[in-house]
Regions:
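Interdomain "pre-motor" coupling segment immediately N-terminal to P-loop NTPase/helicase cores
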Residues: 1-17
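Active-site cores of enzymes that catalyze phosphoryl transfer or operate on phosphate-rich substrates
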Residues: 13-22, 39, 52
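Conserved P-loop NTPase motor core of helicases/translocases
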Residues: 16-17, 21-25, 69, 77, ...
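N-terminal pre-P-loop "Q-motif" helix
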Residues: 28-48, 62-63
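Pre-Walker A (Motif I) flank of P-loop NTPase domains
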Residues: 46-52, 75-76
Length: 140
């Protein structure tokens, strides 16, 4: 990929191109500590990609959920990736609890039970036209 958005994001992730940040007034989140609040504001200012990294127990999930929730007030969708299925499930659960429409992508056998109904496969299976689509597939 050259000269398109995918190529641009690839180059940013590889570190060959610097990411940009917008100038925004900081948003106050009184329920977060100062480090979490600063991280959420940094995510909100990111033009392209934001990474939240830290040791266990430092509030990354809380920070990410708030950042994602706030970003969804400004953008139509957000792609969230994590190092493990458990981390993705945990973030997804917290977002669902806040009323966010989550589509959980990944191997359904590695998704926890609570998040199964949010997987692509389950949504497809629950679609009203699924039986008809399945019968067409079986015939071919």
């Amino acid at each position: 990929a050259k000269g398109n958005r995918l190529a641009e994001l690839r180059d940013i992730l590889l570190g060959t191109v610097k990411t940009g940040f917008r100038e925004l007034y900081p948003v106050r989140f009184p329920w977060l500590n100062s480090t979490q609040e600063s991280a959420v504001n940094k995510v909100l200012c990111a033009r392209d990609v934001a990474i939240v990294h830290g040791p266990p127990g430092t509030g990354k999930t809380t920070t990410l959920v708030e950042a994602i929730y706030e970003t969804l007030h400004r953008e139509p969708q957000v792609l969230v990736c994590a190092q493990s299925n458990m981390a993705v499930d945990w973030i997804s659960e917290k977002l669902v609890d806040r009323g966010v429409n989550v589509l959980r992508i990944g191997n359904p056998t590695r998704v926890n039970d609570k998040m199964l109904s949010f997987t692509y496969e389950r949504r497809f299976e629950n679609h009203p036209l699924y039986p008809e689509l399945w019968s067409i597939r079986v015939k071919n």
